[in-house]
Design a protein with these regions (language model features):
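Alpha-helical protein-protein interaction scaffolds
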Residues: 1-13
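Intrinsic-disorder/low-complexity signal
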Residues: 13-162
Length: 162
């Protein structure tokens, strides 16, 4: 689904530049969103989890994939470099707090702790799209097999205004 979102986001600028695309028309859809957050990481044997705290206090994560406000998170990637994605098409105003849970962050790696790249995107696949990048190392994570707020920390915030 993440790749389909990225491919659909290219349709408008390609058409605006006079180009053509070869994406099957059945796969072209409305994928623009008010808020989109994507993470990817540098260690293929790490399990990094994306958690989003929505303005109403609801947490969207692998065990709560769809929120009452309409936000949804992609499948939990337990192997490889990710990515994991959160998207909400019509986002209520307020802060969307990003938490990273380094469930198995591979700190034994001789190259040091892994890094996570966080893409905070407003108005994804729209002419007014804006993006902020956050690069974070995972050295703040201690232990493994954690699944509660005390063992994570907020690492970024995407604000939606109306």
């Amino acid at each position: 689904m993440i790749a389909l979102m990225e491919a659909n986001a290219l349709v408008v600028p390609i058409k605006a530049a006079g180009g053509r695309w070869t994406l099957d028309k059945r796969l072209v859809g409305l994928t623009d969103t008010d808020a989109r957050i994507v993470i990817e990481w540098t260690a293929d044997d790490a399990d990094i989890d994306l958690w989003i705290d929505e303005p109403n206090g609801e947490r969207v994560m692998y065990s709560n994939k769809r929120s009452s406000a309409g936000g949804q998170i992609s499948n939990d990637m337990t192997d490889g470099y990710g990515p994991e994605e959160y998207a909400i098409r019509r986002a209520p105003a307020g802060p969307y707090r990003v938490r990273i849970n380094g469930y198995d962050a591979d700190r034994i790696n001789p190259n040091g702790p892994g890094h996570v790249l966080i893409r905070l995107q407003r108005n994804f696949a729209r002419a007014s799209e804006a993006q902020e990048l956050v690069d974070l190392d995972l050295s703040f994570q201690n232990g493994r097999d954690r699944d509660n707020e005390d063992d994570t920390k907020p690492v970024a915030t995407l604000r939606v205004g109306r």
